[in-house]
Amino acid sequence: MTRNIRVEELTQRPVEKQKIEVVERKGLGHPDSVADGIAEEISRALCKEYIERFGRVLHHNTDKIQIVAGRSRPAFGGGEVIQPQYILLTGRATRVCGDVEVPVDAIALRTARNHLKRALRNLDLDTHVIIDCKIGTGSADLCDIFDRDASTVPSANDTSYGVGYAPLSETERIVYSTEQELLSLRSRIPAIGEDIKVMGLREDDTIYLTIACAMVDRYIDDLDHYVETKKEIVEEISAKAQSMTRRRVDVQMNVGDNIATGSVYITVTGTSAEMGDDGAVGRGNRANGLITPNRPMSLEATSGKNPINHVGKIYNLLSNLIAKEIAEEVDGVEEVYVKILSQIGKPISQPHIASVQLVLKEGVRLSSAHARAREITDRWLEDIPRVQQMIFHGELQTY
């Protein structure tokens, strides 16, 4: 059956040539990212368990994780957590298949603890956090849509859409890599906490990076040491960012600090969830790891949704894969925007529409790019099982 794929030229100024660009990334230890990470890891763990027990993935969605912030008393040299943060694991999962019961709660709790151990090095799992599992069972109608597809192309669980684009702009790449660079510096500067937010503003040819980094108090002796450490971090990030662009880069960090009064951003655990910052799945980065107001975005939470028929997950990841390949393989294309829309109950390989919009380089005609862009889109839609496998194996980021 022929798919409804529409390829058209999009006439607009490419983001790289716009005067103002804003890009954000919430880092690994930001409460929203922690919620995303736990949700996705639980989904992946359930997929593994279902496949081992039943030979296929059963219905589940674990995309409703909530983090309620605790209270702490940070202090130079080491403070204390007064009230632990509370993490509520919710969502839906198949608990019984035939006469076999799946230990969903045990899997979810173990997976959440393992993720926290990896994501937040200074978090004491025994005293700094309470994890509660309230994952329920799925609704009968959605489970039926899921189960009827055991040996066929999955049917969409919802009428929804996914959005992707390529390539990343220079500012987008710098914002993303800034958080990665900060994480890599932890071995040398252990005071760097994992709760990082990078806000990038490009105004004409100047890129401003505003960084919030939760510093870990036990590794900082006093206010002078804090100021010195902060200066060292800014210098490292400035050098890294400047190496990626010919534009001028201005880096500032923890701009809410008041050095005169000694009010600075230090934490006990390296995350603001210890003292007032709640978190939830879907409130942070989009599927490509960024928040990009200059680009089309879907508000769907990608993390934690099942990778078999939940189009809120599959189409967002698929759209980015399609856009990336078109941008890399089709000559004359400056930007690619992909939107894929489903209809509930219809095969996910047959979307209601797959829209591919191409911003072409000067002098390039749509006719030279149309066929190849359509062929790439069609092939990826045919190969959705490959996307599912990439999700199973953790090859695609969701936040």
Curated annotation (Swiss-Prot):
User: Which pathway does it take part in?
Assistant: Amino-acid biosynthesis; S-adenosyl-L-methionine biosynthesis; S-adenosyl-L-methionine from L-methionine: step 1/1
Cofactor field: Mg(2+)
Judging by the UniProt lineage, the source's domain of life is Archaea
Where ATP binds, per the record, is at: G136, T137, G138, S139, A140, D141
Output the GO biological process annotations, alphabetical, semicolon-separated.
one-carbon metabolic process; S-adenosylmethionine biosynthetic process
Its recorded reaction(s) are: L-methionine + ATP + H2O = S-adenosyl-L-methionine + phosphate + diphosphate
User: Is Translocase included in the keywords of this UniProt record?
Assistant: no
The UniProt record lists the EC number as 2.5.1.6
Cite the GO molecular-function annotations of the record. ATP binding; magnesium ion binding; methionine adenosyltransferase activity
Q: What is this protein called?
A: S-adenosylmethionine synthase
Q: Which organism is it from?
A: Methanothrix thermoacetophila (strain DSM 6194 / JCM 14653 / NBRC 101360 / PT) (Methanosaeta thermophila)
